[in-house]
């Protein structure tokens, strides 16, 4: 019985201590929030630096003229040592790029790399590419990249692609990066068009 009373007293004392600490913390809530925001900012800076270092990233050079020049870019989610680097140039002589090639030739990965690099760069991240790579400032990035290639779903896949394309065309501006993979693919399931 005495042990139970001591345990109850201990709980009451713990509650008093926690109440006092809570009141002290409440008096400094603005300082605590400021410190927390500072730590979050520092953590973000260190995370960006760690990412840049681990992927041998470089700071992209930004322009507002629509020029993109990615030199030896490597998709950040693929194994560093097995990725074939890609060079992508747009905006100087042309602003449309059509990529053709065999299946598993890297077309989709190149599109995804361009989209990711654009978003990463504008978020203040370094990109896994050579120094001197240039990116343009965009107001939006739209992508219709169909990773699903099921013949049974060809009609619904095609309809989905068309809906995405209509949405993109209605919302794109001259400063929008639009990425389309296998545009018009899946129109005839027997052909397996890509």
Question: What is the role of each PLM region?
Answer:
Residues 1-30, 64, 82-84, 92-96:
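Switch/coupling subdomain of P-loop NTPase systems
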Residues 2, 6, 28-31, 35-38, ...:
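Amphipathic alpha-helix face/heptad-repeat signature
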Residues 23-79:
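Phosphate-binding P-loop/Walker A region and its immediate neighborhood
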Residues 55-56, 63-194:
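ATPase nucleotide-binding head domains, primarily ABC-like/P-loop NTPase cores
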């Amino acid at each position: 019985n005495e042990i139970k009373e001591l345990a109850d007293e201990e709980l009451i004392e713990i509650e008093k201590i926690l109440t006092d600490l809570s009141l002290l913390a409440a008096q400094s809530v603005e300082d605590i929030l400021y410190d927390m925001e500072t730590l979050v900012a520092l953590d973000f800076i260190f995370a960006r630096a760690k990412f840049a270092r681990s992927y041998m990233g470089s700071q992209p050079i930004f322009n507002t003229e629509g020029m993109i020049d990615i030199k030896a870019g490597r998709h950040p989610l693929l194994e560093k040592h097995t990725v074939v680097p890609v060079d992508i140039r747009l905006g100087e002589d042309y602003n449309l790029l059509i990529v053709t090639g065999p299946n598993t030739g890297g077309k989709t990965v190149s599109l995804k790399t361009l989209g990711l690099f654009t978003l990463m760069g504008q978020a203040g991240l370094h990109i896994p590419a050579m120094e001197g790579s240039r990116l343009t400032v965009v107001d939006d990035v739209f992508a219709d990249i169909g990773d699903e290639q099921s013949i049974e779903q060809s009609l619904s896949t095609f309809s989905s692609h068309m809906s995405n394309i209509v949405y993109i065309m209605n919302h794109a501006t001259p400063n929008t990066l639009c990425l389309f993979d296998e545009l018009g693919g899946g129109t005839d399931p027997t052909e397996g068009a890509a």
